A protein has these predicted regions:
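S-adenosylmethionine-dependent methyltransferases
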Residues: 1-138
């Protein structure tokens, strides 16, 4: 959803996922929303994708649901971000955020905020949090 919203706002988007059908779903949703196709890459966090490039902003949602995900995701982010970058991760509190924060610190990121307030819609409170990490070149 965030890719579609950002595409609508005119951002330069590259979406990725490791699910084999995610690219098809993204293309279908882009078409339904009368948007041009969004650049998409199916990625395994353990592998390197030099052709993917480096980004100044990475946004992810509900990514930390397995014990090995914090280290894998932090490594993937490190390989695909510029020296100055921001990372926003929506975390529904599955228990791996602290490990992820430690792994991000090892690759030079500081957690600048833990945004907790908000509502999914008018009557539904958001019980998760948005983890915000920044890295700046020296």
């Amino acid at each position: 959803l965030s890719s579609l919203v950002l595409q609508r706002l005119g951002a330069d988007i590259t979406a990725s996922d490791h699910h084999p059908l995610a690219g098809e779903f993204l293309l279908r949703n882009s078409t339904l929303n009368q948007l041009p196709p969004i650049h998409y890459a199916c990625c395994d966090w353990a592998l390197d994708y030099p052709e993917l490039g480096r980004f100044n902003l990475i946004i992810g949602s509900d990514l930390l649901y397995e014990r090995d995900h914090p280290a894998l995701l932090a490594g993937f982010i490190d390989r695909h971000t510029l020296a100055d970058a921001q990372v926003l991760i929506v975390d529904p509190r599955r228990g791996h955020a602290a490990s992820f924060t430690r792994a991000m610190a090892q690759v030079g990121y500081m957690q600048s905020a833990d945004l907790r307030n908000g509502h999914v819609c008018a009557d539904v409170p958001f019980t998760g949090r948005i983890l915000n990490y920044c890295r700046h070149s020296a």
